[in-house]
A protein has these predicted regions:
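Signature for the C-terminal beta-barrel architecture of outer-membrane proteins
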Residues: 151-277
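Surface-exposed coil loops of outer-membrane beta-barrel proteins
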Residues: 102-182, 197
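Residue-level signature of outer-membrane beta-barrel architecture
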Residues: 23, 59-63, 94-98, 150-152, ...
């Protein structure tokens, strides 16, 4: 049924060109090499070191008027794994692109690693880590569903809905949807809104509880940028030595339903998230602080959650903080290298982590 719908949409979008014209054809690749060492264990999270590469290659057919059909393959390979690939999926996407807006049906445009820089921005859609953990960009670098991207003078957003699993006799279907919006009110002030929900359900098979996990975040973003002339550092990806300071203050609300048939297990939580960052040339430093009360969110970073690793409830206020530094290198156009170091405080537990990323994006016209 899904494939039939896609064929119908492609046929509807295709408007025959004159006999002398042919659809444009190009090829593109997006490859992310990742090395993430958060090998520390505490009461809330397990430690794991991840090294590997997530790659996506595709052929693109330009049908005209901003309509593009893409087909290819995506794969994720973990270094040291007994399997050749942890994940292999077909890339199939129909996109309609305008001056500011892009609609995608099929394989989504994720992840966002290294754009913008910083490990705390590395999630698949750039959500706050309590809503969606950063490491999903490496655990699950492939997503498929619907997506609407918009980049305007004041408003930008990423809205999506993606299916992770079908409803079978063994398990419920699983899908997630979200929104990351920011409205620039003034040059130095913006209003963000982020939301994410994970749902498990389906009516074909009754295999387990129906679950929902929702979180919403909103607040203010204050930023100030100054330029002090040409950059003296080659390969730093910046034509000028710009200094940008950013302060984010957001409140969060969570609604966690582990089983709709057992409403007494439903938990609502609230939290505060604050982050200050300073970017200068190819360097970025950040400090973030978190205070949460009964906050629970599927796919959120466990270091922010009000539940222990063994599943027991944390009663009282949860505290988390981290500080870090990131260095970005741009040796050539289309290639970005990022190295970061972070120091974490999880209640009374202190640990450090580091991450190395390299992202290469290339595209070329065939005809």
């Amino acid at each position: 049924m899904g494939w039939a719908c896609l064929v119908i949409i492609v046929c509807a979008a295709w408007r025959p060109a004159p006999a002398h014209a042919q659809p444009g054809l190009s090829a593109a690749a997006d490859v992310i090499f990742y090395g993430d060492n958060t090998e520390f264990r505490n009461a809330f999270s397990e430690g794991e070191t991840m090294f590997g590469v997530a790659a996506r290659g595709e052929a693109r057919i330009e049908l005209g008027n901003g309509v593009r059909l893409a087909a290819g393959v995506a794969a994720n390979q973990r270094f040291g794994s007994e399997s050749a690939f942890e994940l292999v999926r077909p890339v199939l996407a129909l996109s309609v692109r305008g001056r500011r807006s892009t609609f995608i049906f099929g394989t989504l445009e994720t992840p966002r690693a290294a754009t913008p820089p910083g490990p705390d921005h590395a999630g698949p859609h750039g959500l706050l880590p309590p809503l969606q953990r950063e490491r999903l960009a490496f655990d699950r670098p492939f997503e498929a569903g619907l997506q609407w991207l918009f980049h305007g003078a004041r408003l930008e957003h990423d809205l999506w809905l993606q299916w992770q699993r079908l409803n079978t006799a063994e398990h419920r279907e699983r899908l997630d949807g979200g929104a990351r919006l920011q409205w620039r009110v003034a040059r130095t002030l913006a209003l963000p809104l982020q939301a994410h929900i994970v749902h498990e359900g389906g009516q074909l098979f009754d295999a387990g509880p129906v679950r929902d996990s929702l979180a919403i975040a909103s607040g203010v973003v204050i930023s100030k940028a100054t330029e002090s002339g040409p950059s003296a550092s080659p390969g730093d990806g910046s034509g000028k030595a710009a200094t940008t300071g950013t302060l984010e203050l957001l409140g969060l609300w969570s609604h966690h339903v582990p089983d709709r048939q057992l409403p007494q297990r439903t938990r609502d939580g609230a939290a505060f998230f604050g982050r200050a960052a300073l970017e200068w040339r190819a360097w970025r430093t950040h400090l973030l602080m978190w205070r949460g009360d009964d906050y629970l969110k599927d796919e959120g970073d466990p270091n922010y959650q009000s539940v222990r690793r063994d599943g027991t409830r944390w009663r009282g206020i949860r505290d988390y903080a981290e500080t870090g530094v990131t260095r970005t290198f741009v040796p050539v156009a289309g290639a970005v290298l990022e190295a970061s170091f972070r120091y974490h405080r999880i209640e009374d537990h202190y640990e450090y982590s580091y991450r190395v990323l390299a992202r290469v994006q290339v595209a070329g016209k065939i005809r």
